[in-house]
Amino acid sequence: MKPLSSPLQQYWQTVVERLPAPLAEESLSAQAKSVLTFSDFVQDSVIAHPEWLTELESQPPQADEWQHYAAWLQKALSDVSDEAGLMRELRLFRRRIMVRIAWAQTLALVTEESILQQLSHLAETLIVAARDWLYEACCREWGTPCNAQGEAQPLLILGMGKLGGGELNFSSDIDLIFAWPEHGCTQGGRRELDNAQFFTRMGQRLIKVLDQPTQDGFVYRVDMRLRPFGESGPLVLSFAALEDYYQEQGRDWERYAMVKARIMGDSDGVYANELRAMLRPFVFRRYIDFSVIQSLRNMKGMIAREVRRRGLTDNIKLGAGGIREIEFIVQVFQLIRGGREPSLQSRSLLPTLSTIAALHLLSENDAEQLRVAYLFLRRLENLLQSINDEQTQTLPSDELNRARLAWAMDFADWPQLTGALTGHMTNVRRVFNELIGDDESETQEESLSEQWRELWQDALQEDDTTPVLAHLSEDDRKQVLTLIADFRKELDKRTIGPRGRQVLDHLMPHLLSDVCAREDAAVTLSRITALLVGIVTRTTYLELLSEFPAALKHLISLCAASPMIASQLARYPLLLDELLDPNTLYQPTATDAYRDELRQYLLRVPEDDEEQQLEALRQFKQAQLLRIAAADIAGTLPVMKVSDHLTWLAEAMIDAVVQQAWVQMVARYGKPNHLNEREGRGFAVVGYGKLGGWELGYSSDLDLIFLHDCPMDAMTDGEREIDGRQFYLRLAQRIMHLFSTRTSSGILYEVDARLRPSGAAGMLVTSAEAFADYQKNEAWTWEHQALVRARVVYGDPQLTAQFDAVRREIMTLPREGKTLQTEVREMREKMRAHLGNKHRDRFDIKADEGGITDIEFITQYLVLRYAHEKPKLTRWSDNVRILELLAQNDIMEEQEAMVLTRAYTTLRDELHHLALQELPGHVPEDCFTAERELVRASWQKWLVEE
């Protein structure tokens, strides 16, 4: 045994001072002194358990002692009666055996291959023992999980990575995948659980037993992220679910990882063989598969970027020429040719490397250089980790640990060790470049593009350095990284084919580049990722955004400006087609062309296919809404024009819905026979409120009433003859149904018909005569106020003229001023008590004092008060033009009318923009104070003082 170097002899004196009396210096062998000087982990362990050192001296570690691990552990667990005891014994056993392995490794008592075997077998022994103990405990608690035939179902554990390959390093975490064979339920327990519940609960307990730190440490850090769907997927999957996933969604890196997968414990059982046979076709293709080279090149590029980004210098695993590159070289041959060459299907690296050389896939010299380098690097890695039982592959920067490694690796000093290390890593790098290679050097533009690709594909953490996000605040930067990570997790839950992933990987760097250039990057990205989640399984939409950069830019700008638009696009991705043509996107249909465009649009759909007709109506409306909102955001439509467009669109919809309902009713019952001698349908739709007043907003409902002029004795002329007035009732019911039916594209409009005579208690459709009689003899003042903002939005000229005459007659009735003032004011006060002041320290733009409703009540009051003197006041139904009429007819001073108009349009504009932001219609208390004061003054003048 090589004597300790000078720095280590000096350090030994520090060790002596720590040793308790039972471990006096004079009682220790030279071997013990060497190991205790090299490894703080061994030092701490034997100080806590001096008997372990005695055991090491009397029974030194042997190369084949791994064969006894299971028996030794079984004995240690024989008296365990609860989970806490299980956790303690597993931790103590792991530490005791790791001390023995560290002893053998430090003194080079066994080969490096033997060390890897011992480390891997120890992990497997501990995992299997914990699983078997917990399985029995869980069966006692919940019953035994069985399949449909009553056969007990086991939990199978796939050891992945180095654990699966039998090449575990000293301080490694363990990558596991849990599976069970068949669905079924537990039998014999206090209550029945299905197998998924049983194994999920058991899996959670198994992870806790192995992973949870206690005063005795932990057994292994458990990583379950290699399972299907990653962290977002089920903890345990049935064989069928595993097979479905790998057949439909398995990705290149998962295929790469599965090469080393090994079933822990009884690997020759029926279920183990079934699982292996199921996974083999996914891992090893029947044909020679050269696409693997680019996939592995991409993975290596990702690792290289991580090394640069996280500043991982002197990393013997991930650095150029490190352990990972040797693994990549070997697995290239396994994945390309393993399906045709069963001898390449080994999980362990060194036997596979020998096979590669025997098949002349690599030269003997290259294969030998890789073998020697691998053993050198793995010994260095394990020694490095055994100093403190620490998971690291980065060479130390302090003199003590450098001296320790140089001595243990049998070099005179640190420079000699690093010189040999450089030689080995250079050899590895040469073979790697010849076989896999790196992409050619990048231009500055390509480098920037690569950084965006890195941001998307490499799942950066918050502490990563991300130069492309340097311009963002720390909070925004963290939020962007979190959004990307959450989006990737969400993708794992979706069934996305290879083409979809390819398109997404092309799209996302461009999208992130554009979004993250914005100051509001985090907000915009949150809206767009919500949209993308809805379309990732529909490759056509991804391709649209990927192939048309202009469409992507429009999407980003619209989503940034309006969450309402983002929500609409997310709900109805068909609207993405609208982004292709900016000429139509930001240029809404002419106000008088909506009916014609809708008619043309509906010609594509069979007239007798009600479902497609309903869907087409909704799709047309959403596309037009998007255009109006886009123009609104772009500033090309003032508030009055926005409402005009929304109103014309609604009227076109009403026209089409009445047409559909009419065709359906006539097909069923025939036409009312009073129409035989005249044109038209004898039917009208009257719009009230915002529709009647040309003031619709983006989410406004429609206040409608239905009128007809059908005589009492009219009948329909179809085979199924019914009363004419019954026909119009069913027509109105059908119209309501067509508006409110929810399809995949939602409903068309919410319709409120409660403003009809007698409200909800009245008939849904009313004759023109009955309507006139009601308005003259029964209607309340508030119903006459509502009539101010009413107009026919669909109907025969004859019926329209009748309604207009009734409206004019009612509005021009002479009214006693004080009585009217009191009734209007009291109605407003009731509304305010019911709707206003609901939001403390906020101003409700519509309902609170000084808001929109006050202006509407002022105009309605003045029309009802003065129309008998000035009949021209009845001409318009919208507030802005009514205010113009009041000024023109000398009821209101022109200045006051202008002030109220400006306040009204300003407040309406704010409501539109709040709707685009999906925000409620209230603002901070100190907003619009000037407008509100002017409205209050006008209210006081007309409805209080006069």
From Swiss-Prot:
Q: Which UniProt keywords apply?
A: ATP-binding, Magnesium, Multifunctional enzyme, Nucleotide-binding, Nucleotidyltransferase, Transferase
Needed cofactors, names only, are: Mg(2+)
Has keyword Ion transport? no
Q: Which domain of life is it from?
A: Bacteria
Q: Gene3D superfamilies, alphabetically?
A: 1.20.120.1510, Beta Polymerase, domain 2, Glutamine synthase adenylyltransferase GlnE, Nucleotidyltransferases domain 2
- Annotated region Adenylyl transferase: where? 449-946
Q: Note whether Magnesium occurs among the keywords.
A: yes
GO BP, one example?
A: regulation of glutamine family amino acid metabolic process
Q: Which Pfam family, any one of them, does this sequence belong to?
A: GlnE
Q: What class of enzyme is it?
A: transferase
* Gene Ontology terms, MF aspect: [glutamate-ammonia-ligase] adenylyltransferase activity; [glutamine synthetase]-adenylyl-L-tyrosine phosphorylase activity; ATP binding; magnesium ion binding
Cysteines engaged in disulfide bonds, as pairs: none
EC assignment: 2.7.7.89, 2.7.7.42
Annotated region described as Adenylyl removase, given as residue ranges: 1-440
InterPro entries according to UniProt: GlnE, GlnE_rpt_dom, NT_sf, PII_UdlTrfase/GS_AdlTrfase
What job does this protein perform?
A: Involved in the regulation of glutamine synthetase GlnA, a key enzyme in the process to assimilate ammonia. When cellular nitrogen levels are high, the C-terminal adenylyl transferase (AT) inactivates GlnA by covalent transfer of an adenylyl group from ATP to specific tyrosine residue of GlnA, thus reducing its activity. Conversely, when nitrogen levels are low, the N-terminal adenylyl removase (AR) activates GlnA by removing the adenylyl group by phosphorolysis, increasing its activity.
The family assignment reads:
Belongs to the GlnE family.
- Protein name, please? Bifunctional glutamine synthetase adenylyltransferase/adenylyl-removing enzyme
Recorded name of the encoding gene: glnE
